[in-house]
């Protein structure tokens, strides 16, 4: 199956790219510049495409991102510290982000005669991000069947939608994903901060998967205290 992967450069999507390269015919990686403060993630997506020997396209939607105000990822709002499963993390929502990206990706896939678009949403995203939930994935696939009816039949692959991030780490290890060549931190500094929701979730996932985490964090111990507090 000719598959186009939406790849941010993060652990989830890079692991997905390696999985799709092994299980399908990977036709390319598609990334989006929406004005995210952690834009350096795109360099990791580019490196992934080069490693897998496929084209990499970055689509500039910064003008759209500039209109999606109020998010800590695109606006002048601090990225909070803590675990994803906290109300404070809702400030990292970029409204309709996945819907916008997927609509573009399906158009690109149809134009390129690809059979599928793959997206790395997972179970850990459900609490905060509505456009990562199974209901959204199913509804979007249905909508695209109507949108491309008579022109193309493009499937939406979301193999991790019911999985945990620890499951993704285990799967990534299976497909030899170089985890050190992925970027998660929302703060976009030189090193992973170790304190934002995505850093905490990343560090916890390696721990739960029983796999060594090669990531260099500014605060390598914060995740333990915040996860213990959450589970208390």
From Swiss-Prot:
<comment type="pathway">
    <text>Purine metabolism; 7-cyano-7-deazaguanine biosynthesis.</text>
</comment>
<feature type="binding site">
    <location>
        <position position="193"/>
    </location>
    <ligand>
        <name>Zn(2+)</name>
    </ligand>
</feature>
<dbReference type="InterPro" id="IPR018317">
    <property type="entry name" value="QueC"/>
</dbReference>
<comment type="function">
    <text>Catalyzes the ATP-dependent conversion of 7-carboxy-7-deazaguanine (CDG) to 7-cyano-7-deazaguanine (preQ(0)).</text>
</comment>
<keyword id="KW-0436">Ligase</keyword>
<feature type="binding site">
    <location>
        <position position="199"/>
    </location>
    <ligand>
        <name>Zn(2+)</name>
    </ligand>
</feature>
<dbReference type="GO" id="GO:0008616">
    <property type="term" value="P:queuosine biosynthetic process"/>
</dbReference>
<keyword id="KW-0862">Zinc</keyword>
<keyword id="KW-0067">ATP-binding</keyword>
<keyword id="KW-0671">Queuosine biosynthesis</keyword>
<keyword id="KW-0547">Nucleotide-binding</keyword>
<dbReference type="GO" id="GO:0008270">
    <property type="term" value="F:zinc ion binding"/>
</dbReference>
<keyword id="KW-0479">Metal-binding</keyword>
<dbReference type="GO" id="GO:0016879">
    <property type="term" value="F:ligase activity, forming carbon-nitrogen bonds"/>
</dbReference>
<dbReference type="GO" id="GO:0005524">
    <property type="term" value="F:ATP binding"/>
</dbReference>
<feature type="binding site">
    <location>
        <begin position="7"/>
        <end position="17"/>
    </location>
    <ligand>
        <name>ATP</name>
    </ligand>
</feature>
<comment type="similarity">
    <text>Belongs to the QueC family.</text>
</comment>
<dbReference type="InterPro" id="IPR014729">
    <property type="entry name" value="Rossmann-like_a/b/a_fold"/>
</dbReference>
<feature type="binding site">
    <location>
        <position position="185"/>
    </location>
    <ligand>
        <name>Zn(2+)</name>
    </ligand>
</feature>
<dbReference type="Pfam" id="PF06508">
    <property type="entry name" value="QueC"/>
</dbReference>
<protein>
    <recommendedName>
        <fullName>7-cyano-7-deazaguanine synthase</fullName>
        <ecNumber>6.3.4.20</ecNumber>
    </recommendedName>
</protein>
<feature type="binding site">
    <location>
        <position position="196"/>
    </location>
    <ligand>
        <name>Zn(2+)</name>
    </ligand>
</feature>
